[in-house]
């Protein structure tokens, strides 16, 4: 067997195992109190040994656990957590998208919308520029670094934990590096930057990810005053210099405030 055929066979087996595992999760979702292994195997059209092996893998990853009845399995709260994250993202996009579309039409630039996800931001919505001037490399589902993206800086600036920044900086030393000559990589420098962001309520990526591209971001507050989402507009440095920061910031801030109001924030 040549190496190409072997690799293709391994890939096929991996896909097959993934599909079978997902099928087991789907079946278990209909049995909140648990389902016996024999019945699971029957419903999934698998032999018991294969079903048991897949369930062990799912259990190791925290998606299933033994039920009260001997030989039965049930889903864990981890599955619910994933579903809630998806639902949360879908709900916020439903709320925010009309305002983001209006901003896109007014400014003509790339509109980005992200959610805080632990030590990263994740792009959950994006609108391409209507002026055709600049298309960025960012995409929906992309994880954004906190230290060098405008929206990431927003999340760092409004982080409630006092010691979070120091912990983040220490634990991400391999990740924190110069992407361009403008990227901030010193802790003292980012502290000054974040203080300015808190005072002005907006953040900028000044060619810190990509030369020639800049970004302006504003926080979105929920009813508890937490910043779980952020909005940003990307443009060429040429257009920023031509029209000035204020020409863009006013509309971005207005949009962020509108979405914040929709989320129940009243301190505007």
From Swiss-Prot:
This is Uncharacterized HTH-type transcriptional regulator HI_1032. Residues 15-77 form the HTH iclR-type domain. InterPro entries: GAF-like_dom_sf, HTH_MetabolicPath_Reg, Tscrpt_reg_IclR_C, Tscrpt_reg_IclR_N, WH-like_DNA-bd_sf, WH_DNA-bd_sf. GO terms for biological process: negative regulation of DNA-templated transcription. Residues 92-265 form the IclR-ED domain. It comes from Haemophilus influenzae (strain ATCC 51907 / DSM 11121 / KW20 / Rd). PANTHER family: DNA-BINDING TRANSCRIPTIONAL REPRESSOR YIAJ, HELIX-TURN-HELIX TRANSCRIPTIONAL REGULATOR, ICLR FAMILY. SMART domains: HTH_ICLR (SM00346). Residues 37-56 bind DNA. PROSITE patterns: HTH_ICLR (PS51077), ICLR_ED (PS51078). Keywords: DNA-binding, Transcription, Transcription regulation. One of its GO terms (molecular function) is DNA-binding transcription factor activity. It comes from the Bacteria.
């Amino acid at each position: 067997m040549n190496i190409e055929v072997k690799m293709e066979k391994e890939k096929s087996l991996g896909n097959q195992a993934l599909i079978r595992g997902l099928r087991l999760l789907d079946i278990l979702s209909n049995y909140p109190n648990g389902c016996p292994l024999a019945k699971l195997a029957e419903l999934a059209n698998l032999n018991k040994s294969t079903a048991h092996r897949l369930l062990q893998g799912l259990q190791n990853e925290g998606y299933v656990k033994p039920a009260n009845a001997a030989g039965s399995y049930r889903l864990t709260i981890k599955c619910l957590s994933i579903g809630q994250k998806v639902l949360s993202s879908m709900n916020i996009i439903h709320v925010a998208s009309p305002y983001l579309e209006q901003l896109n039409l007014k400014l003509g630039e790339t509109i980005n919308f992200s959610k805080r996800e632990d030590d990263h931001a994740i792009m959950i919505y994006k609108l391409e520029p209507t002026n055709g001037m600049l298309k960025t490399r960012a995409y929906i589902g992309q994880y954004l670094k906190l230290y060098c993206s405008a929206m990431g800086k927003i999340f760092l600036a409004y982080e409630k934990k006092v010691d979070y920044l120091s912990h983040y900086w220490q634990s991400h030393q391999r990740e924190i590096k110069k992407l361009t000559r403008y990227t901030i990589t010193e802790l003292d420098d980012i502290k000054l930057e974040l203080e300015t962001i808190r005072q002005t309520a907006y953040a900028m990526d000044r060619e810190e990810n990509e030369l020639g591209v800049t970004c302006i971001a504003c926080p979105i507050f929920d009813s508890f005053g937490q910043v779980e989402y952020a909005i940003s507009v990307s443009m060429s440095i040429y257009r920023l210099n031509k029209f000035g920061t204020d020409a863009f910031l006013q509309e971005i801030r207005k949009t962020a405030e509108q979405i914040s109001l929709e989320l129940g924030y009243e301190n505007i």
